[in-house]
Every structure is written in structure tokens, then in C-alpha cells.
Regions:
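Long, low-complexity, Lys/Arg-enriched
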Residues: 1-109, 116-125
């Protein structure tokens, strides 16, 4: 059976909802992606920088509690300016060139709700 793999950015604004139980009452797009009954994400590859490690870990734990079948993978990147088109494009290009895609075994999705507008545009390019 083919697996579904999604790529996206950890949303430092939209995915952040604090550390207490109140985080479950806020819409967090990356978490919600993994709560869709009609779409099972087998692996979620989340790009983030070193400053967002803690948020990534919280998100990973929360996803495990609502979608235990989803493997959440940390892809740590270095972006000095997430609003710099050239830098973001180069980062995503390098990521894509270095990724071992297996199109005969996996289907790929891009989650564009999180990340800067520049990142959202660069995913398309």
C-alpha cells in the first residue's frame, strides 16, 4: 500500500498555542492536518530552525496523541531571514534535491498553511 508523506514548516505563530491544556482549544493547522479522518498522513516531514526545536517536540507529541500512525520527522534548517525570497528558495531547493523521493511507493503533499508568505510561494516553485 502506498504511503502518504506531507512536507511543511513548523508554524511558529499558527502552531504555537502555549504549553498547557489550553493549546487544545486553538486551531493549529499542522496538528489539524493529522486529524483528518479521510486523509491519513503516514509521515510528516516538518522543517524548522534551531529556535523552534521545542515547538517541534510539542507538536510531535500532540500529533502522536491524535494520530499515532503518523511518523513526525524533524528537518532542521537554517534560515536567517524567512522573508528573503532567494534564501528561502535556495533552502527548499536544496532540501528537495537532497530528499530521497520514492514515487513508486509514496504520494507527496505540501502543507502550505504554515510558514511565511515567501515560503508558501517558494513551495510552488
Amino acid at each position: 500500500m502506498r504511503k502518504t508523506v506531507a512536507f511543511g514548516f513548523v508554524g511558529t505563530v499558527l502552531d504555537y498555542a502555549g504549553r498547557g491544556s489550553q493549546r487544545w482549544s486553538k486551531w493549529r493547522p499542522t496538528l489539524c492536518l493529522c486529524q483528518q479522518e479521510s486523509l491519513v498522513i503516514d509521515r510528516l516531514e516538518l522543517l524548522h530552525d534551531a529556535r523552534s526545536r521545542s515547538l517541534f517536540e510539542t507538536l510531535k507529541r500532540d500529533i502522536a496523541s491524535v494520530s499515532p500512525e503518523t511518523e513526525v520527522v524533524s528537518v532542521e534548517i537554517e534560515l536567517h531571514n524567512p522573508w528573503d525570497f532567494e534564501e528561502v528558495y535556495a533552502c527548499l531547493h536544496d532540501f528537495a534535491r537532497g530528499y530521497e523521493f520514492q514515487p513508486e511507493k509514496e504520494d507527496y503533499l505540501i502543507h502550505i498553511t504554515t510558514g511565511t508568505h515567501v515560503a508558501q510561494i517558494c513551495w510552488f516553485l
